[in-house]
Amino acid sequence: MPKYYLVVSSVTTAQRLQKLCREAGISVSVVHTPQGLTDRGCSYSVVVKEPDFPRAQSLASENQLPVRQQFLYQDGEYIECP
């Protein structure tokens, strides 16, 4: 199943978004952003399954948690989302 990576600047932001998602019934995980996806050094990503991606985006926005970039991971490839 395709997954989305919501890239954030700190582990604290990632954990806050993770908590909000879990409270909303969305299963997510926090990981170091895969190497090569960003040029900003160390960052973290909140990984969410495709059906829950729009709600996770909304939760980040509603709670003023800045998402730097978003990527779709499918068939072994990362595709940046607008």
Where are these regions (language model features)?
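Amphipathic, hydrophobic secondary-structure cores in small proteins
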Residues: 2-5, 9-22, 26-50, 54
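Short flexible/disordered coil segments
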Residues: 1, 31, 66-70
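C-terminal structural segments of small proteins and small subunits
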Residues: 49-82
